[in-house]
Amino acid sequence: MEAKIDELINNDPVWSSQNESLISKPYNHILLKPGKNFRLNLIVQINRVMNLPKDQLAIVSQIVELLHNSSLLIDDIEDNAPLRRGQTTSHLIFGVPSTINTANYMYFRAMQLVSQLTTKEPLYHNLITIFNEELINLHRGQGLDIYWRDFLPEIIPTQEMYLNMVMNKTGGLFRLTLRLMEALSPSSHHGHSLVPFINLLGIIYQIRDDYLNLKDFQMSSEKGFAEDITEGKLSFPIVHALNFTKTKGQTEQHNEILRILLLRTSDKDIKLKLIQILEFDTNSLAYTKNFINQLVNMIKNDNENKYLPDLASHSDTATNLHDELLYIIDHLSEL
């Protein structure tokens, strides 16, 4: 017995592919129905400026996919979501403890991949710093979003507070992707950092998601009808409605919005009532749609290349890349 213990403690921990398969089940479940690959398509387009070699690009893509899908596992637990991509969420199949552990495990698997991006110590240190900074930002934003929801009506965020939260929550993974690529890029001819562009893209992405959750049938089939209301989420239209009714002194409507959010209801009729308030009483859905279009136009009308890559000396590349990026933006503005 002592010999076996001695052998055990003098070697690395034993791990098998069978063990790996077991603890990866919640993660593999979410992969059964892939997402729309928006982030991977964006990486491919941005790499037309960054010019990362294929091996590095593949690793960055893998890091992003691991982080994105793992964050969805945690999101679904935090939101008590029944559906993800039209199928039962992982935590309802494998349990909350296993799903949390798997998601956290995949975060560290993603961190482990960073070491494969370079053998140069200063660059590796920079990449790990970027990784840590943006995961911290992501959790800060997610934490605020949850706090506002779970302790409503203690804090009713303003639009500015909401946008700052999204810069952390949604912007974190967008920025992590871009900053890794910029740090690794052998090219410098794009003229300026694309972080402002990616920040704006992240804001558009999140507000559009908030809007479609209340309006889009396809999203209803994948996540459940107006699931943000069941969650009690302070999404962009809800934030506008609460501030609008408060400013206008519409106490009855203000309290009704709060009441429905606090119900955490799955009742379709009650959720439709709140949507009607947002549609007709506070005009919050129209305001949200208009706000998205304003943000999109900041990019589409960017004649000075404040946000888009500056590729004046590479006119063919610039034209094609700008067209592709504007196509992505147009897709995000389809409501």
Swiss-Prot record:
Cofactor comment text: Binds 2 Mg(2+) ions per subunit.
UniProt-reported outcome of changing E7G: No effect. Monomer
Broad enzyme group: transferase
Gene Ontology BP, a term: terpenoid biosynthetic process
Name of the gene: BTS1
Residues reported in the UniProt entry to bind dimethylallyl diphosphate: R84, K169, T170, Q206, N213, K223, K233
Binding-site residues, Mg(2+) 1: D75, D79
Compartments where located: Cytoplasm
EC number(s) stated in the UniProt entry for this protein: 2.5.1.-, 2.5.1.1, 2.5.1.29, 2.5.1.10
Family: Belongs to the FPP/GGPP synthase family.
Pfam family, one: polyprenyl_synt
Catalytic activity: isopentenyl diphosphate + dimethylallyl diphosphate = (2E)-geranyl diphosphate + diphosphate; isopentenyl diphosphate + (2E)-geranyl diphosphate = (2E,6E)-farnesyl diphosphate + diphosphate; isopentenyl diphosphate + (2E,6E)-farnesyl diphosphate = (2E,6E,10E)-geranylgeranyl diphosphate + diphosphate
Resulting phenotype, Y107A: Reduced affinity for isopentenyl diphosphate (IPP)
Principal subcellular localization: cytoplasm
Residues involved in isopentenyl diphosphate binding: K36, R39, H68, R85
Gene source species: Saccharomyces cerevisiae (strain ATCC 204508 / S288c) (Baker's yeast)
Record annotation: effect of changing I9G: Mostly monomer. Exclusively monomer. Reduces enzyme activity 1000-fold
Binding-site positions, Mg(2+) 2: D75, D79
More details: Present with 2840 molecules/cell in log phase SD medium.
Role: Catalyzes the trans-addition of the 3 molecules of IPP onto DMAPP to form geranylgeranyl pyrophosphate. Required for the membrane attachment of YPT1 and SEC4. May be involved in vesicle trafficking and protein sorting.
Cystine pairs: none
Transport found in the keyword field: yes
The protein's required cofactors: Mg(2+)
Record lineage: Eukaryota, Fungi, Dikarya, Ascomycota, Saccharomycotina
Protein name: Geranylgeranyl pyrophosphate synthase BTS1
Keyword line: Carotenoid biosynthesis, Cytoplasm, Isoprene biosynthesis, Magnesium, Metal-binding, Protein transport, Transferase, Transport
